[in-house]
Amino acid sequence: SALNPVFDRRVCVSRELLERGIAVDYLDLVAHDADLETEAYLAGLPVRSIVAADASREPFWELGERRTVDVGRYDVILQRKDPPVDDLFVRHHRHFIAAPESILQINRPPATYELSEHTIGMRYPEFSAPTVVCSSFEELVAAVRDQDGEAVCKPKNTYCGIGVSFVPSDAEEHVLRAYWNQWAPEVIVQAYLPAIEDSGDLRILTLGDQVLGSVLRVPADGSRLANLHQGATAARLEPTPRQLACCAEVSADLNPLGLHLLGLDFIGEHLTEVNFTSPTTLVQINQVNGIRADRVMVDQLERMRAG
């Protein structure tokens, strides 16, 4: 499988697990049949052992021969899926609802595909940026017009900043119509937060009740997109007490749903998104803070597994 250890936590976490003598297997869903009956699907996972993992050289990891195992042999399953949440992901992931409750799944379906990362912040109005989900062109126009000067429009099911647009609140209707035609049937409108220009976008990564670390994403010159895939750079910034209070509230709410590993995004003091299908930046957290957040993550996994 192709890996990019600049963004992908799998290499550093696998290395830490192997250094502790913990066996790690890798399941590539492309090699499995999503249309199997659930019992057969879970009893016949085509996995390969991860023999070695090292982000400093290629290949970044070494895999053993493929073999078939039953899901019940595992203590922890770490799921990772680059957005968007598509039909193939759901068809695979729904099978894991039936996995034994004794297995710690990071993160567990069906919440992984029933909830939206872009809108889940609306559950926490005390902390979140003002957000409207528009399911018609008329709603989009009204939401944009309601903003003070500028609105942030984003598709509901994209990633890496794809489709994010900064729109004047008095934009002509043909501009909004073109955006709607491209990204319908649902578009999210958020208030524009000027803090993005001064202080970027802070990602705080949590696992259970443990904060793994944080990293500030600073937009490139001339850009307002604070996404590392869109040219932003990583920098160090400590979370504020209010941001940490938000993390605690969100974790306490979502952990019981099976969403344990979370990437919370803040512009200033406002929560803008909560990532749970593929929350990255563990590598950048290590780099800018000079820590080993992967070790903290594995420590927390062991505590959570022990109950």
Language model regions located:
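Phosphate-binding site of ATP-dependent enzymes
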Residues: 137-138, 147-150, 157-246, 250
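Conserved N-proximal alpha/beta basic substrate-recognition cap immediately N-terminal to
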Residues: 2-21, 25-133, 139
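Short glycine-enriched loops at secondary-structure junctions
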Residues: 109-113, 217-220, 267-270
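Flexible, charged surface loops at secondary-structure boundaries
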Residues: 69-74, 145-147, 182
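Residue-level detector of anion-binding/catalytic polar loops
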Residues: 23, 104, 150, 210, ...
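Conserved residues at the C-terminal ends of beta-strands
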Residues: 80, 217, 277
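ATP-dependent carboxylate activation and anion-phosphoryl transfer catalytic cores
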Residues: 238-307
